[in-house]
Amino acid sequence: MIDKSAFVHPTAIVEEGASIGANAHIGPFCIVGPHVEIGEGTVLKSHVVVNGHTKIGRDNEIYQFASIGEVNQDLKYAGEPTRVEIGDRNRIRESVTIHRGTVQGGGLTKVGSDNLLMINAHIAHDCTVGNRCILANNATLAGHVSVDDFAIIGGMTAVHQFCIIGAHVMVGGCSGVAQDVPPYVIAQGNHATPFGVNIEGLKRRGFSREAITAIRNAYKLIYRSGKTLDEVKPEIAELAETYPEVKAFTDFFARSTRGLIR
């Protein structure tokens, strides 16, 4: 169904069964598949292809040659009706690719809201990207990667499958991330190693001086105390009782499966 207030360019192809919301704009030479839902106010500039069982929220801007919901690159994929879900107010720039999930990985590739995905960024099957994240030009996420809120991944950076990028992390450009990056950390290199706390990012987002100090103390326990992670976990949990921002570390530890960058 195409809402009567939506615009569809005469050269665009919107297949029967697709849903186009109010005030959406489907530009020249776009292709929208039969199981696609485009939310209110979302703009497909031109030459955008949206396939598969894909749901896109409202007020997104999707630029030319982006491909969303296409068949993933997992050799086990056998055509199952897996999905892509994208939230609201994202800017998805030229030639970005976002692939549908796999049955083995839960069947869903998910992108939240208010993200900036720069030119040629790639989000593989079963990835989860939170809110207000930035993937710079040519940043690539392998399958099953999680990127938490406010994370920034630099240009030409590759993230290994199943890795977790914590909230407020900054990964420098041209890096290779092979293990999990704890929240608030700056990481750089191939393989990526920690370079301290993303202090400037936390200041910009309104973290108090006391909270930043507590986060830095947790970082020092993890990386500079000479203790094992199991040894410092109780100390970080105790610190989190006073400073709730530190709880992001304890929650992260519970999710981590690949070990932390070192």
Curated annotation (Swiss-Prot):
Involved in the biosynthesis of lipid A, a phosphorylated glycolipid that anchors the lipopolysaccharide to the outer membrane of the cell. Its EC number is 2.3.1.129. Keywords: Acyltransferase, Cytoplasm, Lipid A biosynthesis, Lipid biosynthesis, Lipid metabolism, Repeat, Transferase. InterPro entries: Acetyltransf_C, Acetyltransf_C_sf, Hexapep, Hexapep_transf_CS, Lipid_A_LpxA, Trimer_LpxA-like_sf. It is found in: Cytoplasm. It comes from Escherichia coli (strain K12). It catalyses: a (3R)-hydroxyacyl-[ACP] + UDP-N-acetyl-alpha-D-glucosamine = a UDP-3-O-[(3R)-3-hydroxyacyl]-N-acetyl-alpha-D-glucosamine + holo-[ACP]. The keyword Cell membrane does not apply. The lineage of its organism: Bacteria, Pseudomonadati, Pseudomonadota, Gammaproteobacteria, Enterobacterales. The gene is lpxA. Changing G189S: In strain: SM101; temperature-sensitive. This is Acyl-[acyl-carrier-protein]--UDP-N-acetylglucosamine O-acyltransferase. It comes from the Bacteria.
